[in-house]
Amino acid sequence: MNFGIIIPAYNEAESIGVTLQSLLNQTYLPYQIIVVDDGSTDTTAEVVNQIATQYPVVQLVQRSEKGEHLPGAKIVQTFNYGLPYLKEAVEVICKFDADLIFPNNYLETMCQQYNENPQLGMFGGFCYIERNGSWVLENLTNKDHLRGAVKSYRKACFEAIGGLKIAMGWDTADELLARY
């Protein structure tokens, strides 16, 4: 299964390298990783380019146009900017935040779930945060809600729901559209 990962990034120089390394160290490797730099003023682009020289699966796309400043719109606009760069062979489209550290079996687990459940259109995961030296579950949303920070879509599902909506609540709208 070919995973195409799009990572919107803005001033993520301190975290994007760790995020990319956690994806490149997976037991099941991604087919393509696109980092869309949304006009960062730090060294985000340089960090990504340095990694991309060692790993051809990583590609930097720079977005200089300014999108609408509506709640929830900017992240989706930046993600959408990366969509045309996905290769045709991508079977699962992933939208991941730029400040995540993935367990080394994350993509393998995701692949297994998609393979075992042909009707599965979306898959996500839990987010943990470091608090006082320990990793604890971030309880911002209901456990059956797929967090916007870490979402994947079977390509057919993504196309059927018409992609991500440029609006506040995009990460709930996609789930509702996929269910109904």
Give, region by region, the residue ranges found by the protein language model.
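Conserved nucleotide-sugar donor-binding
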Residues: 147-162
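Cell-envelope/extracellular polymer assembly enzymes that use nucleotide-activated donors
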Residues: 2-4, 32, 173
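Conserved donor NDP-sugar-binding/catalytic core segment of glycosyltransferases
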Residues: 101-137
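Short beta-strand-to-loop acidic/aromatic patch adjacent to the donor-nucleotide binding site
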Residues: 89-101
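A short, conserved alpha-helix in the catalytic core of glycosyltransferases
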Residues: 157-160, 167-180
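N-proximal low-complexity "stem/linker" segments adjacent to membrane-targeting elements
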Residues: 1-25
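Active-site nucleotide-sugar/metal-binding loop of Leloir-type enzymes
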Residues: 76-92
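Acidic donor-binding segment of Leloir-type glycosyltransferases
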Residues: 20-67
